[in-house]
A protein has these predicted regions:
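Catalytic cofactor-binding cores of redox enzymes
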Residues: 2-58
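C-terminus-biased signal that marks the final domain/tail of proteins
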Residues: 11, 15, 23-25, 49-338
Length: 338
């Protein structure tokens, strides 16, 4: 409601979407640009996928438990010729968003791919984005690991993978792109103390070549390099530690990516096991020994972040070693040359 009030008062120059999550529910807000907006509460058993396009459709002004909107959302659309009641019920997407040729390659494939990942038997066609369901119930519960995989998707295993095929002109825009600055996953577990129940997983840079690191709400300090990072590479920046590695991998994706991805997969699996052990120990301590529980959590954070950066530097050095050897072989000028 606060963001909606700002949109109504100040306006928005373009469409955007924002998710809100707490211990009870998730809401998703989209703007219609200008001073119009719509927010919908996600059904408890459903998930929502969005690319760079408005996706919300249905609006029930009488259902305050599941919908919030700008007061003139429907009347403005009618006045401006964006909605004709004679043609059926109000559709937010049809009134305030669009489906054009660019969407068929830039947006539709991403939504279609993830919906089919969580609902493999879905019969939608990738080129018909206007038919995609807004909300879907997955065939199995979606885990944090599944969300990581989703955000790393680049159509691997298909002809649309731009990295494996060395094709920067691939029409389908992948989910994982090099220009990603950070990728975030928010997890709220209401049955746990907030200190460990609320976790933000952050991957610095390109998700498919990065590692998702767990930042617990209860941590008290970060690593020294976490607050450093500009558009200039630097050795003391956490961001650039991972970004440098990704830049090197992209010089020969097929040669370097498999080892890096395997290393991060192993690291995340090991970290997940360590998280579980830490959380169990925290639960045994936090009521009677809160300071000890806090130290336990902080020590886990410090060790995890330090180990991730150490691994990133080792992987970087491995690639530099290989590239140095290649360069030497290419420009060796051996004395035995004819």
């Amino acid at each position: 409601k606060l963001l909606g009030d700002i949109i109504e008062q100040k306006g928005a120059g373009e469409g955007f979407g924002v998710a809100f999550i707490d211990s009870k529910e998730i809401w998703y807000l989209e703007t219609g640009s200008g001073h119009q907006w719509l927010a919908v509460r996600l059904p408890a058993d459903s998930y929502f996928v969005s690319a760079n396009q408005g996706r919300l459709r249905h609006y029930d002004p009488n259902d305050n438990a599941n919908y919030m909107a700008s007061p003139t959302l429907v009347s403005f659309a009618k006045k401006q010729g964006l909605y004709d009641p004679a043609r059926g019920e109000f559709d937010f997407h049809q009134a305030y968003s669009q489906d054009n040729k660019n969407d068929t390659t830039y947006n539709y494939p991403r939504v279609w791919t993830l919906q089919h990942q969580f609902n493999p038997h879905l019969d939608t066609v990738v080129s018909e984005g206007e038919t995609f369901p807004v909300f879907l119930t997955p065939i199995t519960k979606i885990s944090v690991a599944a969300v990581k995989n989703a955000l790393r998707n680049h159509y691997q295993g298909t002809s649309h993978d731009p990295y494996a095929s060395h094709n920067p002109q691939e029409p389908w825009r992948p989910i994982s792109v090099f220009r990603t600055q950070e990728s975030h996953i928010l997890q709220v577990r209401p049955k746990l103390p907030q200190a460990i129940g609320n976790v933000e997983y952050i991957a610095y840079g390109m998700p498919s070549l990065s590692v998702y690191l767990p930042y617990y709400q209860g941590m008290r300090h970060y690593q020294p390099g976490d607050d450093k990072g500009t558009d200039r590479a630097s050795n003391d920046s956490t961001y650039w530690t991972f970004r440098t590695l990704q830049t090197l991998v992209m010089q020969d994706y097929n040669a370097f990516a498999p080892d890096v991805q395997h290393a991060w997969k192993t690291f995340e699996q090991q970290t997940a096991k360590q998280q579980y052990k830490m959380e169990q120990s925290y639960l045994r301590l936090y009521a009677s020994h809160p300071k000890e529980a806090q130290r336990l959590l902080q020590n886990f954070e410090d060790k995890t972040m330090q180990n991730a950066q150490t691994l990133a530097r080792r992987l970087t050095n491995n690639i530099i070693t290989t590239m140095t050897y290649r360069t030497d072989m290419k420009y060796h000028f051996s004395s035995t040359q004819p």
